[in-house]
């Protein structure tokens, strides 16, 4: 596997997380835990950092309902949010302190990037303070240079995906712009245009996606991807049945099949188009058991070159991974705690049970507690 994009993260004072100190991240990070343990909040940290990088800190706070909703137990309990991430064995780092205002917003109290040449300066990295601007973090400045620009570029290469909406108004089922194909959007609203682009320019990846969908849905032959005749700037997701020449579009697919198509596209797209960090909250939702095992294989394959962070409630999906891939979330004293599993303490158990079975037997933690 390649070196993970991120190697450590520290989170303090964010939503249900009072303190997670220097958590090591691997190429694969599978979060398990009961409802309310804070798995989604941990993944939400990355969305928060992305918003900060994009210059949308104030917009994020407003949409969340104010700073009190983001701070751990509110501003009476927590006086700041502190986030710190490191890249490439801590050579480059980024940290930000956010404090509440009287107007129930957040302001940047301190922000810095770090560079650590451990051979020349073994004791500590040197820091470069960043100045905030117009209420937004300095890392959002597109004119930044040096280490700041390096970190800003890395923060822009993450993407958080939610493919939960497969209703009649799902973005995946709507007509998309043909030209909207630079990357797969977080809700797969441009799934048709992105697949069309892959078919035209990245045939090998398109073929892998098609074959993966055929394994989950044997009735599926191929996608029909052409700009609409009435408006050549638009395209919709259509497909061909192996035993019928009737018209089929995304609405003709089951919810699980449509989600799997989006997931297969995400994990099998060419490396040059893929985000450096892929984050997905409960990707197994609505999938058939066989599709869940396929999903595990897709994640492991993608993680050879891309860092993956997923949360799951599926014991079957958990079975596809090694103990060291797993982060267990528990709520201890009203705060989210994360710990990584290790193979050695589980060695005798794993001779008789799978990882998912051990989780169901409450041998791993991450289960509801009375």
Q: Where are the regions that the model predicts?
A:
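GG-anchored amphipathic helix commonly corresponding to the ABC/SMC/Rad50 NBD signature/C-loop
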Residues: 234-236, 241-245, 249-280, 290-293
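The Walker A (P-loop) glycine that initiates the GxxxxGKT/S ATP-binding motif of P-loop NTPases
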Residues: 33, 282, 313
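Electropositive, glycine-dotted interaction segments
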Residues: 88-216, 221-224
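C-terminal lobe/lid and adjacent interdomain/linker elements of RecA-like ASCE P-loop ATPase modules
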Residues: 1-4, 293-370
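Short beta-strand segments that buttress and anchor functional surface loops
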Residues: 81-88, 239
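Pre-Walker A-like glycine/lysine-rich segment at the N-terminus of P-loop NTPase domains
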Residues: 1-80
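Conserved catalytic network of the ASCE P-loop NTPase/AAA+ motor domain
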Residues: 75-76, 89, 268-273, 300-304, ...
């Amino acid at each position: 596997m390649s070196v993970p994009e991120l190697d450590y993260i520290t989170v303090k004072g964010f939503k249900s997380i009072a303190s997670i100190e220097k958590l090591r991240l691997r190429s694969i990070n599978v979060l398990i835990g009961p409802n309310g343990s804070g798995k989604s909040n941990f993944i939400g940290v990355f969305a928060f950092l992305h918003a900060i990088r994009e210059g949308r800190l104030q917009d994020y706070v407003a949409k969340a309902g104010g700073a009190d909703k983001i701070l751990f137990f509110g501003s009476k309990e927590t006086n700041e949010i502190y986030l710190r991430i490191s890249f490439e064995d801590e050579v480059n780092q980024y940290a930000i302190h956010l404090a509440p205002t009287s107007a129930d917003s957040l302001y940047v109290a301190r922000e810095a990037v770090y560079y650590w040449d451990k051979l020349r300066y073994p004791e500590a990295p040197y820091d470069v303070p960043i100045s905030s601007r117009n209420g937004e973090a300095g890392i959002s400045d597109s004119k930044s240079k040096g280490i700041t620009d390096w970190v800003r570029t890395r923060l822009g290469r993450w993407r958080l995906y939610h493919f939960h909406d497969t209703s009649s108004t799902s973005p995946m089922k709507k007509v998309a712009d043909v030209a909207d194909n630079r990357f797969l959007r977080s809700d797969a609203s441009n799934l048709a245009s992105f697949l069309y682009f892959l078919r035209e320019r990245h045939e090998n990846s398109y073929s892998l996606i098609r074959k993966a969908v055929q394994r989950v849905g044997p009735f599926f032959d191929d996608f029909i991807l052409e700009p609409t005749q009435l408006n050549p700037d638009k395209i919709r997701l259509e497909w061909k049945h192996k035993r019928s020449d009737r018209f089929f579009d995304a609405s003709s697919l089951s919810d699980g099949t449509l989600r799997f198509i989006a997931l297969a596209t995400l994990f099998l797209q060419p490396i040059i188009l893929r985000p450096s960090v892929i984050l997905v909250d409960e990707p197994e939702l609505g999938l058939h058991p066989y599709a869940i095992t396929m999903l595990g294989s897709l994640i492991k394959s993608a993680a050879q070159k891309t860092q993956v962070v997923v949360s799951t409630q599926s014991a079957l999906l958990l079975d596809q991974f090694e103990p060291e891939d797993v982060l267990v979330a528990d709520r201890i004293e009203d705060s989210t705690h994360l710990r990584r599993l290790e193979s050695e303490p589980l060695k005798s158990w794993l001779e008789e049970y799978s990882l998912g079975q051990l989780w169901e037997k409450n041998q791993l933690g991450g289960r509801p507690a009375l």
